Curated annotation (Swiss-Prot):
Keyword Hydrolase: yes
InterPro entries: DHS-like_NAD/FAD-binding_dom, Ssirtuin_cat_dom, ThsA_STALD
Activity regulation information from UniProt: In vivo probably activated by a cyclic ADP-D-ribose generated by ThsB (might be 3'cADPR).
Name listed for the protein in its UniProt record: NAD(+) hydrolase ThsA
UniProt: 3'cADPR binding residues: G287, S288, L324, F355, R373, K390, G407, E411
Protein backbone atom coordinates (compact mmCIF):
# COMPACT_ATOMS: atom_id res chain seq x y z
CA UNK A 1 0.00 0.00 0.00
CA UNK A 2 1.05 3.57 -0.61
CA UNK A 3 0.57 6.60 1.61
CA UNK A 4 -1.81 9.37 0.56
CA UNK A 5 0.86 11.76 -0.75
CA UNK A 6 2.60 8.92 -2.58
CA UNK A 7 -0.68 8.02 -4.33
CA UNK A 8 -1.23 11.64 -5.40
CA UNK A 9 2.31 11.82 -6.80
CA UNK A 10 1.91 8.53 -8.68
CA UNK A 11 -1.39 9.72 -10.21
CA UNK A 12 0.18 12.99 -11.35
CA UNK A 13 3.27 11.35 -12.83
CA UNK A 14 1.22 8.79 -14.77
CA UNK A 15 -0.86 11.63 -16.23
CA UNK A 16 2.27 13.59 -17.21
CA UNK A 17 3.77 10.48 -18.81
CA UNK A 18 0.63 10.05 -20.90
CA UNK A 19 0.96 13.66 -22.07
CA UNK A 20 4.75 13.44 -22.67
CA UNK A 21 5.43 16.15 -20.08
CA UNK A 22 7.55 14.19 -17.61
CA UNK A 23 11.28 14.50 -16.89
CA UNK A 24 13.82 13.08 -14.44
CA UNK A 25 16.50 14.94 -12.51
CA UNK A 26 19.01 12.41 -11.18
CA UNK A 27 21.46 13.05 -8.37
CA UNK A 28 24.27 11.01 -6.87
CA UNK A 29 21.91 8.99 -4.69
CA UNK A 30 20.39 7.30 -7.74
CA UNK A 31 23.79 5.92 -8.78
CA UNK A 32 25.01 5.00 -5.29
CA UNK A 33 23.48 1.46 -5.30
CA UNK A 34 25.57 0.70 -8.41
CA UNK A 35 28.72 1.23 -6.37
CA UNK A 36 29.59 4.82 -7.19
CA UNK A 37 30.70 7.03 -4.31
CA UNK A 38 28.99 10.21 -3.22
CA UNK A 39 30.76 13.56 -3.10
CA UNK A 40 31.89 13.11 0.48
CA UNK A 41 33.61 9.80 -0.24
CA UNK A 42 35.06 11.15 -3.48
CA UNK A 43 36.79 13.94 -1.58
CA UNK A 44 37.66 12.03 1.60
CA UNK A 45 41.29 11.17 0.62
CA UNK A 46 41.86 14.78 -0.44
CA UNK A 47 40.47 16.14 2.81
CA UNK A 48 42.97 13.98 4.71
CA UNK A 49 45.78 15.59 2.73
CA UNK A 50 44.39 18.99 3.77
CA UNK A 51 44.21 17.80 7.39
CA UNK A 52 40.46 18.42 7.45
CA UNK A 53 37.69 16.15 8.73
CA UNK A 54 35.33 15.47 5.82
CA UNK A 55 32.57 14.43 8.24
CA UNK A 56 32.55 17.93 9.70
CA UNK A 57 32.38 19.63 6.31
CA UNK A 58 29.12 20.64 4.65
CA UNK A 59 30.45 22.89 1.87
CA UNK A 60 32.12 20.26 -0.31
CA UNK A 61 32.42 22.60 -3.30
CA UNK A 62 34.65 24.87 -1.23
CA UNK A 63 36.62 21.86 0.00
CA UNK A 64 37.41 20.89 -3.60
CA UNK A 65 38.48 24.47 -4.24
CA UNK A 66 40.76 24.43 -1.15
CA UNK A 67 42.52 21.38 -2.55
CA UNK A 68 43.04 23.03 -5.94
CA UNK A 69 44.35 26.18 -4.23
CA UNK A 70 46.84 24.26 -2.10
CA UNK A 71 48.11 22.12 -4.96
CA UNK A 72 48.09 24.76 -7.70
CA UNK A 73 45.97 22.60 -9.99
CA UNK A 74 43.28 19.90 -10.11
CA UNK A 75 45.33 16.95 -11.38
CA UNK A 76 44.77 14.85 -8.25
CA UNK A 77 41.08 15.77 -8.28
CA UNK A 78 40.83 14.57 -11.87
CA UNK A 79 42.55 11.31 -10.90
CA UNK A 80 39.94 10.72 -8.20
CA UNK A 81 37.17 11.14 -10.76
CA UNK A 82 38.87 8.67 -13.11
CA UNK A 83 39.40 6.14 -10.31
CA UNK A 84 35.88 6.33 -8.85
CA UNK A 85 33.56 7.39 -11.67
CA UNK A 86 35.51 6.21 -14.70
CA UNK A 87 34.89 2.59 -13.70
CA UNK A 88 32.14 0.89 -15.73
CA UNK A 89 29.21 -0.37 -13.67
CA UNK A 90 25.79 -1.79 -14.43
CA UNK A 91 22.57 0.25 -14.15
CA UNK A 92 20.55 -0.21 -10.98
CA UNK A 93 17.00 -1.63 -10.96
CA UNK A 94 15.70 1.95 -10.71
CA UNK A 95 17.66 3.00 -13.80
CA UNK A 96 16.23 0.00 -15.65
CA UNK A 97 12.65 0.85 -14.68
CA UNK A 98 13.05 4.47 -15.78
CA UNK A 99 14.59 3.43 -19.11
CA UNK A 100 11.51 1.34 -19.94
CA UNK A 101 9.23 4.36 -19.56
CA UNK A 102 8.70 6.88 -22.39
CA UNK A 103 10.78 9.60 -20.74
CA UNK A 104 12.39 11.86 -23.31
CA UNK A 105 14.24 14.24 -20.98
CA UNK A 106 16.82 13.46 -18.30
CA UNK A 107 18.89 15.96 -16.36
CA UNK A 108 21.67 14.88 -14.03
CA UNK A 109 24.58 16.24 -12.03
CA UNK A 110 26.21 12.79 -12.14
CA UNK A 111 29.31 12.08 -14.21
CA UNK A 112 28.56 8.36 -14.72
CA UNK A 113 26.85 6.81 -17.75
CA UNK A 114 24.22 4.66 -16.01
CA UNK A 115 21.27 6.50 -17.55
CA UNK A 116 22.70 6.20 -21.05
CA UNK A 117 23.59 2.55 -20.53
CA UNK A 118 20.10 1.71 -19.24
CA UNK A 119 18.53 3.41 -22.27
CA UNK A 120 20.88 1.56 -24.61
CA UNK A 121 19.94 -1.76 -23.00
CA UNK A 122 16.31 -0.98 -23.89
CA UNK A 123 17.24 -0.35 -27.51
CA UNK A 124 16.81 3.40 -27.10
CA UNK A 125 19.17 6.05 -28.45
CA UNK A 126 20.43 8.55 -25.87
CA UNK A 127 21.50 11.98 -27.08
CA UNK A 128 24.09 12.92 -24.45
CA UNK A 129 24.81 16.62 -23.82
CA UNK A 130 27.69 17.69 -21.59
CA UNK A 131 29.38 20.49 -23.53
CA UNK A 132 27.91 23.69 -24.97
CA UNK A 133 28.57 22.45 -28.50
CA UNK A 134 26.45 19.35 -27.86
CA UNK A 135 23.36 21.52 -27.37
CA UNK A 136 23.36 22.66 -30.99
CA UNK A 137 23.67 19.10 -32.31
CA UNK A 138 20.88 16.53 -32.59
CA UNK A 139 21.53 12.80 -32.65
CA UNK A 140 19.56 11.08 -35.40
CA UNK A 141 16.71 8.90 -34.16
CA UNK A 142 17.19 9.86 -30.53
CA UNK A 143 14.79 8.48 -27.95
CA UNK A 144 15.85 10.68 -25.05
CA UNK A 145 18.10 13.64 -24.31
CA UNK A 146 20.44 13.25 -21.32
CA UNK A 147 21.71 16.61 -20.08
CA UNK A 148 24.81 16.16 -17.92
CA UNK A 149 25.14 19.65 -16.52
CA UNK A 150 28.29 18.91 -14.50
CA UNK A 151 30.11 17.03 -17.23
CA UNK A 152 30.91 13.44 -18.08
CA UNK A 153 33.41 10.87 -16.84
CA UNK A 154 34.89 10.72 -20.34
CA UNK A 155 36.26 14.27 -19.82
CA UNK A 156 37.18 14.28 -16.12
CA UNK A 157 39.45 17.32 -16.41
CA UNK A 158 36.43 19.41 -17.45
CA UNK A 159 33.98 18.14 -14.81
CA UNK A 160 32.30 20.86 -12.74
CA UNK A 161 33.51 20.33 -9.18
CA UNK A 162 35.33 23.40 -7.79
CA UNK A 163 33.96 26.64 -6.41
CA UNK A 164 35.51 28.63 -9.27
CA UNK A 165 33.56 26.53 -11.77
CA UNK A 166 30.30 26.84 -9.85
CA UNK A 167 30.61 30.60 -9.57
CA UNK A 168 31.26 31.02 -13.29
CA UNK A 169 28.73 28.38 -14.41
CA UNK A 170 25.90 30.81 -15.33
CA UNK A 171 28.37 32.65 -17.58
CA UNK A 172 30.30 29.78 -19.19
CA UNK A 173 27.36 27.35 -19.38
CA UNK A 174 24.52 29.79 -19.97
CA UNK A 175 22.91 27.55 -22.67
CA UNK A 176 22.51 24.75 -20.08
CA UNK A 177 20.95 27.21 -17.63
CA UNK A 178 18.51 28.34 -20.32
CA UNK A 179 17.65 24.78 -21.38
CA UNK A 180 17.02 23.61 -17.82
CA UNK A 181 14.97 26.71 -17.05
CA UNK A 182 12.78 25.95 -20.05
CA UNK A 183 12.26 22.32 -19.08
CA UNK A 184 11.43 23.23 -15.48
CA UNK A 185 8.70 25.53 -16.78
CA UNK A 186 7.23 23.14 -19.37
CA UNK A 187 7.70 19.69 -17.78
CA UNK A 188 6.98 18.02 -14.46
CA UNK A 189 10.22 16.81 -12.88
CA UNK A 190 10.84 14.00 -10.43
CA UNK A 191 14.05 14.62 -8.48
CA UNK A 192 15.72 11.37 -7.40
CA UNK A 193 18.83 10.84 -5.28
CA UNK A 194 19.40 14.56 -5.28
CA UNK A 195 20.94 16.98 -2.80
CA UNK A 196 19.54 20.50 -2.99
CA UNK A 197 22.69 22.25 -1.84
CA UNK A 198 23.93 22.42 -5.44
CA UNK A 199 24.65 26.11 -6.19
CA UNK A 200 23.79 25.74 -9.89
CA UNK A 201 20.38 24.26 -9.28
CA UNK A 202 19.67 26.72 -6.49
CA UNK A 203 20.45 29.58 -8.89
CA UNK A 204 18.18 28.21 -11.62
CA UNK A 205 15.29 27.44 -9.27
CA UNK A 206 15.56 30.92 -7.76
CA UNK A 207 15.36 32.56 -11.19
CA UNK A 208 12.25 30.59 -12.08
CA UNK A 209 10.62 31.40 -8.74
CA UNK A 210 11.26 35.13 -9.25
CA UNK A 211 9.89 35.12 -12.80
CA UNK A 212 6.79 33.00 -12.19
CA UNK A 213 6.12 33.71 -8.50
CA UNK A 214 3.00 31.71 -7.56
CA UNK A 215 2.52 30.21 -11.04
CA UNK A 216 5.41 27.76 -10.94
CA UNK A 217 4.93 24.23 -12.25
CA UNK A 218 4.58 21.53 -9.59
CA UNK A 219 7.56 19.17 -9.30
CA UNK A 220 8.24 16.20 -7.04
CA UNK A 221 11.17 14.93 -5.03
CA UNK A 222 11.52 11.71 -3.05
CA UNK A 223 13.38 11.82 0.26
CA UNK A 224 14.01 8.99 2.68
CA UNK A 225 12.73 9.81 6.14
CA UNK A 226 15.39 10.57 8.73
CA UNK A 227 15.77 7.29 10.58
CA UNK A 228 16.79 6.88 14.21
CA UNK A 229 18.77 3.74 13.34
CA UNK A 230 21.19 5.85 11.28
CA UNK A 231 22.40 7.85 14.30
CA UNK A 232 24.38 6.96 17.39
CA UNK A 233 22.45 9.29 19.69
CA UNK A 234 19.11 11.05 20.03
CA UNK A 235 20.66 14.49 19.72
CA UNK A 236 21.99 13.91 16.19
CA UNK A 237 18.75 12.23 15.16
CA UNK A 238 16.60 15.12 16.41
CA UNK A 239 18.90 17.66 14.76
CA UNK A 240 18.73 16.01 11.33
CA UNK A 241 15.00 15.38 11.63
CA UNK A 242 14.47 19.09 12.24
CA UNK A 243 16.79 20.01 9.38
CA UNK A 244 14.91 17.75 6.97
CA UNK A 245 11.67 19.50 7.90
CA UNK A 246 13.24 22.88 7.14
CA UNK A 247 14.56 21.63 3.77
CA UNK A 248 11.11 20.30 2.84
CA UNK A 249 9.50 23.67 3.61
CA UNK A 250 12.23 25.51 1.73
CA UNK A 251 11.76 23.39 -1.40
CA UNK A 252 8.08 24.30 -1.34
CA UNK A 253 9.19 27.83 -2.29
CA UNK A 254 10.28 26.38 -5.62
CA UNK A 255 7.06 24.37 -6.01
CA UNK A 256 8.92 21.12 -5.32
CA UNK A 257 6.73 18.76 -3.33
CA UNK A 258 8.74 16.35 -1.19
CA UNK A 259 7.28 12.86 -0.78
CA UNK A 260 8.82 10.81 2.02
CA UNK A 261 9.58 7.09 1.98
CA UNK A 262 10.64 4.80 4.84
CA UNK A 263 13.39 2.94 2.96
CA UNK A 264 15.09 3.18 -0.41
CA UNK A 265 13.42 0.01 -1.69
CA UNK A 266 10.16 1.98 -1.44
CA UNK A 267 11.47 4.08 -4.34
CA UNK A 268 11.61 0.96 -6.50
CA UNK A 269 8.05 0.08 -5.46
CA UNK A 270 6.85 3.55 -6.44
CA UNK A 271 8.58 3.42 -9.83
CA UNK A 272 7.15 -0.06 -10.46
CA UNK A 273 3.66 1.19 -9.59
CA UNK A 274 4.06 4.15 -11.96
CA UNK A 275 5.14 1.73 -14.70
CA UNK A 276 2.23 -0.63 -14.04
CA UNK A 277 -0.32 2.19 -13.98
CA UNK A 278 1.06 3.77 -17.14
CA UNK A 279 1.17 0.49 -19.04
CA UNK A 280 -2.42 -0.28 -18.02
CA UNK A 281 -3.52 2.56 -20.31
CA UNK A 282 -2.26 0.46 -23.23
CA UNK A 283 -4.35 -2.56 -24.25
CA UNK A 284 -3.14 -5.44 -26.42
CA UNK A 285 -5.58 -7.67 -28.31
CA UNK A 286 -4.47 -11.24 -28.93
CA UNK A 287 -6.62 -13.33 -31.21
CA UNK A 288 -7.15 -15.06 -34.53
CA UNK A 289 -10.14 -16.63 -36.21
CA UNK A 290 -10.67 -18.75 -39.29
CA UNK A 291 -14.14 -19.69 -38.08
CA UNK A 292 -16.42 -17.55 -35.93
CA UNK A 293 -18.67 -20.06 -34.18
CA UNK A 294 -22.39 -19.41 -33.72
CA UNK A 295 -21.92 -15.63 -33.86
CA UNK A 296 -20.78 -15.57 -37.47
CA UNK A 297 -18.16 -13.36 -39.06
CA UNK A 298 -20.29 -10.22 -39.51
CA UNK A 299 -21.44 -9.95 -35.88
CA UNK A 300 -17.94 -10.76 -34.61
CA UNK A 301 -16.29 -8.10 -36.74
CA UNK A 302 -18.93 -5.56 -35.70
CA UNK A 303 -18.13 -6.30 -32.04
CA UNK A 304 -14.38 -6.00 -32.61
CA UNK A 305 -14.79 -2.69 -34.42
CA UNK A 306 -16.94 -1.38 -31.58
CA UNK A 307 -14.39 -2.60 -29.02
CA UNK A 308 -11.67 -0.60 -30.77
CA UNK A 309 -13.91 2.49 -30.74
CA UNK A 310 -14.80 2.15 -27.06
CA UNK A 311 -11.20 1.73 -25.92
CA UNK A 312 -10.17 4.92 -27.74
CA UNK A 313 -13.18 6.72 -26.24
CA UNK A 314 -12.04 5.62 -22.77
CA UNK A 315 -8.58 7.09 -23.35
CA UNK A 316 -6.68 3.86 -23.93
CA UNK A 317 -3.91 3.30 -26.43
CA UNK A 318 -4.27 0.01 -28.28
CA UNK A 319 -1.70 -2.37 -29.68
CA UNK A 320 -2.28 -5.16 -32.17
CA UNK A 321 -0.34 -7.64 -34.26
CA UNK A 322 -3.32 -7.77 -36.65
CA UNK A 323 -4.27 -11.37 -35.94
CA UNK A 324 -6.01 -13.14 -38.83
CA UNK A 325 -9.76 -12.49 -38.88
CA UNK A 326 -9.56 -10.35 -35.72
CA UNK A 327 -7.07 -7.52 -35.96
CA UNK A 328 -8.40 -5.70 -39.02
CA UNK A 329 -11.87 -5.04 -37.61
CA UNK A 330 -10.45 -4.08 -34.21
CA UNK A 331 -7.98 -1.61 -35.71
CA UNK A 332 -10.57 -0.20 -38.11
CA UNK A 333 -12.87 0.72 -35.24
CA UNK A 334 -10.02 2.39 -33.39
CA UNK A 335 -8.87 4.39 -36.43
CA UNK A 336 -12.42 5.55 -37.14
CA UNK A 337 -12.76 6.85 -33.58
CA UNK A 338 -9.35 8.54 -33.69
CA UNK A 339 -10.34 10.45 -36.83
CA UNK A 340 -13.81 11.25 -35.47
CA UNK A 341 -12.16 12.86 -32.45
CA UNK A 342 -9.75 14.72 -34.73
CA UNK A 343 -6.66 13.45 -32.92
CA UNK A 344 -3.64 14.59 -34.91
CA UNK A 345 -1.20 11.77 -34.16
CA UNK A 346 -2.47 8.23 -34.64
CA UNK A 347 0.75 6.87 -33.12
CA UNK A 348 -0.27 8.34 -29.76
CA UNK A 349 -3.27 6.00 -29.66
CA UNK A 350 -2.47 3.05 -31.87
CA UNK A 351 0.43 0.66 -32.46
CA UNK A 352 0.19 -1.86 -35.30
CA UNK A 353 2.90 -4.41 -36.07
CA UNK A 354 2.13 -7.05 -38.67
CA UNK A 355 3.92 -10.35 -38.12
CA UNK A 356 6.65 -10.97 -40.73
CA UNK A 357 5.45 -13.84 -42.92
CA UNK A 358 8.21 -14.39 -45.45
CA UNK A 359 10.79 -16.19 -43.32
CA UNK A 360 11.50 -19.54 -44.96
CA UNK A 361 13.25 -21.38 -42.12
CA UNK A 362 10.63 -22.53 -39.53
CA UNK A 363 13.02 -22.26 -36.56
CA UNK A 364 14.14 -18.77 -37.54
CA UNK A 365 10.53 -17.72 -38.12
CA UNK A 366 9.50 -18.98 -34.68
CA UNK A 367 12.36 -17.08 -33.00
CA UNK A 368 11.53 -13.89 -34.88
CA UNK A 369 7.84 -14.16 -33.98
CA UNK A 370 8.67 -14.71 -30.30
CA UNK A 371 10.87 -11.60 -30.27
CA UNK A 372 8.13 -9.73 -32.14
CA UNK A 373 5.55 -10.72 -29.54
CA UNK A 374 7.80 -9.63 -26.67
CA UNK A 375 8.32 -6.27 -28.35
CA UNK A 376 4.58 -5.82 -28.88
CA UNK A 377 3.70 -6.69 -25.30
CA UNK A 378 6.53 -4.88 -23.52
CA UNK A 379 4.81 -1.47 -23.48
CA UNK A 380 1.29 -2.70 -22.70
CA UNK A 381 -0.38 -3.39 -19.38
CA UNK A 382 -3.58 -5.24 -20.29
CA UNK A 383 -3.91 -8.17 -22.69
CA UNK A 384 -7.29 -9.26 -24.06
CA UNK A 385 -7.56 -12.75 -25.55
CA UNK A 386 -10.35 -13.39 -28.06
CA UNK A 387 -11.28 -16.62 -29.87
CA UNK A 388 -7.96 -18.09 -31.06
CA UNK A 389 -8.31 -20.67 -33.81
CA UNK A 390 -6.54 -21.29 -37.09
CA UNK A 391 -6.59 -23.71 -39.99
CA UNK A 392 -3.85 -26.23 -40.72
CA UNK A 393 -3.47 -28.31 -43.85
CA UNK A 394 -2.19 -31.86 -43.92
CA UNK A 395 0.72 -31.86 -46.43
CA UNK A 396 -0.10 -35.37 -47.65
CA UNK A 397 -3.89 -35.55 -47.79
CA UNK A 398 -4.52 -31.84 -48.23
CA UNK A 399 -7.22 -32.03 -45.57
CA UNK A 400 -7.84 -28.81 -43.64
CA UNK A 401 -8.51 -28.83 -39.90
CA UNK A 402 -9.45 -26.09 -37.43
CA UNK A 403 -7.18 -26.13 -34.36
CA UNK A 404 -6.55 -23.86 -31.39
CA UNK A 405 -4.03 -21.07 -32.02
CA UNK A 406 -0.72 -21.90 -30.34
CA UNK A 407 0.51 -18.35 -30.99
CA UNK A 408 -2.09 -17.02 -28.56
CA UNK A 409 -0.78 -19.45 -25.97
CA UNK A 410 2.72 -18.01 -26.37
CA UNK A 411 1.40 -14.45 -26.13
CA UNK A 412 -0.40 -15.41 -22.92
CA UNK A 413 2.79 -16.73 -21.32
CA UNK A 414 4.89 -13.75 -22.46
CA UNK A 415 2.25 -11.34 -21.15
CA UNK A 416 2.21 -13.15 -17.82
CA UNK A 417 6.01 -13.00 -17.55
CA UNK A 418 5.90 -9.26 -18.26
CA UNK A 419 3.32 -8.70 -15.52
CA UNK A 420 0.35 -7.76 -17.74
CA UNK A 421 -3.24 -8.07 -16.58
CA UNK A 422 -4.61 -11.07 -18.49
CA UNK A 423 -8.24 -10.99 -19.68
CA UNK A 424 -9.28 -14.02 -21.77
CA UNK A 425 -12.84 -13.60 -23.05
CA UNK A 426 -14.02 -17.12 -22.33
CA UNK A 427 -17.39 -16.62 -24.04
CA UNK A 428 -15.60 -16.30 -27.40
CA UNK A 429 -14.54 -19.94 -27.17
CA UNK A 430 -11.52 -21.72 -28.65
CA UNK A 431 -8.11 -20.91 -27.11
CA UNK A 432 -9.55 -17.92 -25.22
CA UNK A 433 -11.89 -20.23 -23.31
CA UNK A 434 -9.02 -22.57 -22.48
CA UNK A 435 -6.98 -19.64 -21.14
CA UNK A 436 -9.98 -18.37 -19.17
CA UNK A 437 -10.33 -21.76 -17.46
CA UNK A 438 -6.60 -21.76 -16.73
CA UNK A 439 -6.88 -18.46 -14.86
CA UNK A 440 -10.07 -19.38 -13.00
CA UNK A 441 -8.51 -22.64 -11.78
CA UNK A 442 -5.69 -20.67 -10.13
CA UNK A 443 -7.21 -17.21 -9.79
CA UNK A 444 -5.18 -16.08 -6.78
CA UNK A 445 -1.98 -16.75 -8.70
CA UNK A 446 -2.94 -14.52 -11.61
CA UNK A 447 -4.82 -11.93 -9.53
CA UNK A 448 -3.50 -11.99 -5.95
CA UNK A 449 -5.41 -9.93 -3.39
CA UNK A 450 -8.19 -9.16 -5.86
CA UNK A 451 -11.61 -8.15 -4.57
CA UNK A 452 -14.70 -10.40 -4.74
CA UNK A 453 -16.25 -7.73 -6.99
CA UNK A 454 -13.40 -8.08 -9.47
CA UNK A 455 -13.66 -11.87 -9.56
CA UNK A 456 -17.41 -11.67 -10.07
CA UNK A 457 -16.94 -9.29 -13.02
CA UNK A 458 -14.17 -11.49 -14.44
CA UNK A 459 -16.30 -14.65 -14.31
CA UNK A 460 -19.01 -12.95 -16.36
CA UNK A 461 -16.59 -12.97 -19.32
CA UNK A 462 -17.34 -16.69 -19.61
CA UNK A 463 -21.12 -16.32 -19.75
CA UNK A 464 -22.58 -17.22 -23.13
CA UNK A 465 -24.20 -14.41 -25.13
CA UNK A 466 -26.20 -14.62 -28.35
CA UNK A 467 -24.48 -11.51 -29.73
CA UNK A 468 -20.81 -10.69 -29.08
CA UNK A 469 -21.58 -6.95 -28.79
CA UNK A 470 -23.12 -7.76 -25.39
CA UNK A 471 -19.59 -8.49 -24.16
CA UNK A 472 -18.59 -4.82 -24.37
CA UNK A 473 -20.04 -3.80 -21.00
CA UNK A 474 -18.56 -6.89 -19.33
CA UNK A 475 -15.07 -6.18 -20.68
CA UNK A 476 -15.43 -2.54 -19.62
CA UNK A 477 -16.39 -3.58 -16.07
CA UNK A 478 -13.31 -5.80 -15.70
CA UNK A 479 -10.88 -3.20 -17.04
CA UNK A 480 -12.41 -0.52 -14.81
CA UNK A 481 -11.74 -2.66 -11.72
CA UNK A 482 -8.08 -3.36 -12.50
Amino acid sequence: MFEHEQKIMIDRIVKELEENNFAIFAGAGLSAPAGYVNWKELLRPLSIELNLDIDKETDLVSLAQYYVNENHGRNRLTERLIDEVGVAREPTPNHKILAKLPISTYWTTNYDDLIEKALDNEGKIADKKFTKNHLSQTKKGRSAVVYKMHGDASLPDQAIITKDQYESYPLHFAPFVTALSGDLVSKTFLFLGFSFNDPNLDYILSRIRIHFEQNQRQHYCIFRKVNRADYSNDEDFSYNLLKQQFVIKDLARFSIKVVLIDAWNDLTRILEEITKRFRCKNVFLSGSAHEFGSWGQTATELFLSKLGEVLIQEGFKITSGLGLGIGNAFISGAIKEIYNRKYTKIDDYLTMKVFPQFVADPTERKNIWTAWRKDLLSQTGIALFFMGNKIIKDPESGKQTIVLADGMDEEFHIAHELGLKLIPIGASGYKAKELFNQIISDFDHYYPNSSPKFREAFEKLNEEVDEPVKLLSKIHDVIKLI
